[in-house]
Amino acid sequence: MKNSIKNIFESERGLLLLPFVSLGTPNTQINKQAIIAMDKNGANIIELGIPYSDPVADGPVIQDAYNKAIKNGVNIRKAFKILMNLKGKIKSPIIVFIYYNQLLNYGINKFLEKLIQLEVQGIIVPDLPYDESQILKKKCTINNIALISLIALTSSFSRIKKIARNAEGFLYLISKTGVTGGTGKLMNKLKIIIKTIQKLTSKPVVVGFGINSRRQIKQLIEWNSNGIVIGSPCVQILLQSSKEVCVIKLSGLIKQIKESTSSTSN
């Protein structure tokens, strides 16, 4: 399997859009339609979260989505069925967001074999410390799946250097302390870390956690970020809108964000 994440960053200009939704929200059929709609309306790469009962990195919106999906019977196997139904229907590379215990319980080798079958391009394991990730990284590299590394605002220079120089796919820079979602002004420290990373590696820098406004997007373009992850706003639409209109609303949000990334970069 050829990994297309690198090609996306090389071929697309400006700030790339990486929307996130939880698999199975609000139900499997509408979830599939929502993912296809994100692809058609401007997503460059799509992140998909596998529901988990203890998502320590996620805020209340995504926690709620995971809990509801689990109550509806969505587990790893059902998540894979949704992914199988997406094969050939979207052009954006898919990255799966999964917690480490889920991965261990399912079996790492079996999980990676399934990702290859489903043509998934990358994996994010938010609760796996970088220093403990080498075995998984080696297995991912062999299978041409990018294990995406995360960098926190609190990371030391030596840690940033180590992670940046061994990164695959892109570097996921967490824009704030705490969990996903929420609002607020971006810290100036983020600008410094983006600059630091880009001096250490040619790998793209993608910023996520709490990105939800045009002002933030404008700042990140000025700070030379290569991409943004938009998660909670997308999930919130699937949770709070009626089933008849949630895909339409999500399509509108993706279009609006895509226009912001384009218009502010001109």
Curated annotation (Swiss-Prot):
Pathway where this protein functions: Amino-acid biosynthesis; L-tryptophan biosynthesis; L-tryptophan from chorismate: step 5/5
Source organism superkingdom: Eukaryota
Subcellular location: Plastid, Chloroplast
EC number of the protein: 4.2.1.20
Catalytic activity, reaction form: (1S,2R)-1-C-(indol-3-yl)glycerol 3-phosphate + L-serine = D-glyceraldehyde 3-phosphate + L-tryptophan + H2O
One Pfam short name: Trp_syntA
Cellular component aspect of the GO annotation: chloroplast; cytosol
Keywords for this protein: Amino-acid biosynthesis, Aromatic amino acid biosynthesis, Chloroplast, Lyase, Plastid, Tryptophan biosynthesis
GO molecular function terms attached to this record: tryptophan synthase activity
CDD domains xref list: Tryptophan_synthase_alpha (cd04724)
Catalytic residue list: 47 (proton acceptor), 58 (proton acceptor)
Protein function: The alpha subunit is responsible for the aldol cleavage of indoleglycerol phosphate to indole and glyceraldehyde 3-phosphate.
Family: Belongs to the TrpA family.
Subunit structure: Tetramer of two alpha and two beta chains.
Name of the featured protein: Tryptophan synthase alpha chain
Species the sequence originates in: Cyanidium caldarium
Lineage: Eukaryota, Rhodophyta, Bangiophyceae, Cyanidiales, Cyanidiaceae
